[in-house]
């Protein structure tokens, strides 16, 4: 059911905003375990299929690229990512929010799909 809820959430987000013009997502190339890899693969499959169905461009960005753009180091730690976003005036609740903000800044700076 988690994948159906995810697709429903994407559709609701698309309908309750001015629409989604592009999707950037963190491209994880290494997983801690088999379950994590399966879950990630399932979400990525549904995300890319949903984007293609709605003709929305999408791009995965490697974790190291996001970290390097935000901190100058491709292997930056969680505290480094949080500090980088705080330096930009944000107060991320955790490293996941900091990573999402860093990805947003990267996407904006690229000016669209690379």
Language-model regions: role of each:
Residues 1-114:
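Phosphate- and other anionic-substrate recognition elements at nucleic-acid/protein interfaces
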């Amino acid at each position: 059911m988690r994948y159906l809820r995810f697709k429903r959430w994407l559709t609701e987000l698309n309908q309750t905003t001015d629409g989604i013009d592009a999707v950037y997502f963190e491209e994880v190339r290494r997983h801690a375990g088999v379950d994590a890899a399966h879950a990630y693969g399932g979400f990525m499959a549904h995300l890319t299929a949903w984007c293609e169905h709605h003709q929305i461009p999408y791009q995965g960005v490697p974790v190291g690229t996001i970290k390097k753009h935000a901190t100058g180091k491709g292997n930056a730690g969680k505290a480094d990512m949080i500090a980088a976003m705080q330096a930009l005036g944000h107060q991320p609740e955790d490293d996941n929010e900091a990573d999402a903000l860093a990805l947003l800044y990267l996407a904006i700076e690229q000016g669209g799909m690379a």
